[in-house]
UniProtKB/Swiss-Prot annotation:
PANTHER family from the UniProt entry: AWPM-19-LIKE FAMILY PROTEIN
Induction of synthesis: Induced by heat shock. Induced by drought, cold and salt stresses. Induced by abscisic acid (ABA).
Keyword Transmembrane helix appears in the UniProt entry: yes
Gene name of the record: PM19L
Provenance organism: Oryza sativa subsp. japonica (Rice)
Protein name (Swiss-Prot/TrEMBL): Membrane protein PM19L
Amino acid sequence: MAGVGRTMIAPLLVLNLIMYLIVIGFASWNLNHYINGETNHPGVAGNGATFYFLVFAILAGVVGAASKLAGVHHVRSWGAHSLAAGAASALIAWAITALAFGLACKEIHIGGYRGWRLRVLEAFVIILAFTQLLYVAMLHGGLFSGNHAAGAGGYGGDYPADHHHKPAAAARV
């Protein structure tokens, strides 16, 4: 059963990693031109929410890409010891991506001219908010399924990796 989990999570992991790298590229380009005062550049423009969106988009991209490194480690080792790091970093990356998603929605709602690069960045952040949530749900589904290596200190309560844990003796009355 562990193979089924890996085969489901691994493609989503790769997809999200590629999308986060694209977000880093577009957000850094837009932020660089925005900081340089080139808001009349055909690809930048924007409105009052643009600066905040760009900051959170680049933050979401960097944290998301870093969390995918923990995810790659988890998929390779597929144990409970790596699941905690992978799931925690994925949840943090999703939270920051959700903030960027909200700012993308606000930027779209305010309107005004936004260049094609900014619109592509908005689209990628919106898509990533949902694919990252799916990835987090799949990881947390594995947290409770017990499909991970038993010798890694699973969550079943048996503590197979803890050599010092001894079950409490029955109380004598």
